[in-house]
């Protein structure tokens, strides 16, 4: 939440205008990366803790997890060495414990499915997810040639195995 509010605020300043983060139209200068990672992490923490608490009571299914957060940081900050940082290593250790299902499609299909994301941003995201999913995803579902109902069926099969 804090990161979102701050990003909206910073989008009004020309020194932060850019499309590394296409959702807010900002670019965080490289000197501010460590600070921005902390801002993003502080926004993630309440969500993560709530999910962990709820998972003690019931299975929790969500579309955004730690793997997504790591990809978000790497791509929006153009920070491929994030996993070498203290915060990155900490999150990687937590992400290994999550049961991730990587839902993917080929880049051409993704470009048809999303309207407001620049192709260059999408390509970076796909590349990052493809590499990290090898280490952090329990299962991968390719939705390229599947209908939404077929994809849901595959997801349910994966969930039964987890």
Please report, for each region that a protein language model flagged, where it lies by residue.
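Generic surface-pattern signal
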Residues: 11, 15, 44, 75, ...
């Amino acid at each position: 939440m804090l990161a979102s509010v701050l990003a909206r605020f910073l989008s009004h300043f020309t020194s932060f205008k850019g499309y590394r983060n296409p959702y807010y139209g900002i670019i965080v200068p490289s000197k501010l990366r460590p600070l921005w990672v902390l801002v993003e992490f502080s926004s993630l923490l309440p969500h993560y803790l709530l999910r962990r608490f709820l998972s003690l009571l019931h299975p929790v299914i969500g579309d955004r997890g730690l793997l997504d957060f790591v990809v978000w940081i790497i791509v929006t900050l153009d920070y491929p060495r994030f996993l070498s940082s203290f915060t990155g290593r900490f999150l990687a250790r937590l992400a290994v414990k999550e049961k991730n299902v990587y839902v993917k499609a080929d880049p051409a299909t993704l470009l048809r499915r999303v309207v407001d994301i620049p192709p260059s941003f999408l390509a970076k995201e796909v590349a990052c997810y493809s590499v990290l999913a090898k280490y952090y995803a329990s299962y991968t579902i390719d939705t390229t040639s599947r209908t939404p109902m077929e994809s849901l069926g595959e997801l349910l099969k994966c969930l039964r195995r987890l």
